[in-house]
């Protein structure tokens, strides 16, 4: 980080009504595949990952509000860093039915993968013993690759717990989306939103995610692929 930059800290009032959340771009690279298996029809791998992060801004979010979105404030100089950790990767099936009904297929597809990533992480708590807070996620909006990784440098075991119980996590995720009563295309905090989302809970599509999860749980087969040129990472 440039040496001439600095952070100025000021004390805020006790009743300050906001908290901040960073806006990030991330890119995963598989360093080593430790093991692979099929979860239903989905090929899933447990890997050593190199995660590159760029913090380009933050949002102010009002305390107590249900929708975890806020006003964006961009940094003049983004902060970049990287680390090695462990995680899983799988290739989500395309939500072809919802895409066919959409006026913007590219947005609908990418937003479906992003929402699926959110739901699998947040929905894993009851399956893995409460490790979702220790996990990060990246969905690649063109290829449909979804990475879920340990937030701790070197790994923490959280993603391995998810890898071992992945079928149950996928079934649980499908029911979370299907049974949520909200009618919003993007979903809501009960289904697709994440309080840790690095994209301000944008690029989310509830119905696209539901089709993806239904296809997975119905046994549709996919194999791992390489990222494609122009893949848009969403976190």
Question: What kind of feature is each model-predicted range?
Answer:
Residues 187-191:
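Short cysteine clusters
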Residues 225-235:
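Extended alpha-helical interface modules used as scaffolds for assembling large macromolecular complexes
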């Amino acid at each position: 980080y440039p040496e001439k930059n600095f952070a100025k800290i000021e004390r805020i009032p006790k009743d300050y009504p906001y908290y901040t959340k960073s806006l990030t771009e991330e890119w995963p690279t598989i360093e080593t595949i430790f093991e692979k298996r099929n979860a239903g029809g989905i090929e899933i791998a447990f890997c050593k990952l190199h995660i590159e992060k760029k913090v380009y801004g933050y949002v102010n979010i009002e305390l107590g509000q249900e929708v975890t979105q806020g006003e964006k404030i961009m940094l003049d100089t983004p902060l970049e860093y990287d680390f090695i950790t462990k995680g899983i990767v799988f290739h989500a099936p395309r939500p072809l039915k919802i895409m066919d009904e959409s006026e913007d297929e590219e947005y609908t597809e990418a937003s479906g993968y992003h929402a699926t990533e959110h739901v699998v992480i947040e929905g894993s708590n009851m399956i893995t013993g409460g490790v979702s807070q220790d996990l990060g996620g990246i969905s690649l909006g063109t290829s449909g690759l979804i990475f879920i990784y340990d937030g701790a440098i070197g790994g923490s075991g959280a993603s391995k717990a998810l890898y071992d119980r992945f079928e149950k996590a996928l079934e649980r995720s499908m029911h979370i989306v299907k049974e949520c009563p909200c009618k919003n295309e993007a979903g809501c905090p009960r289904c697709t939103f994440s309080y840790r989302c690095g994209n301000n809970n944008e690029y989310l599509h509830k119905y696209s995610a539901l089709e993806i999860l239904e296809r997975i749980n119905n046994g549709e087969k996919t194999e791992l692929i390489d990222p494609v040129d122009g893949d848009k990472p969403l976190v």
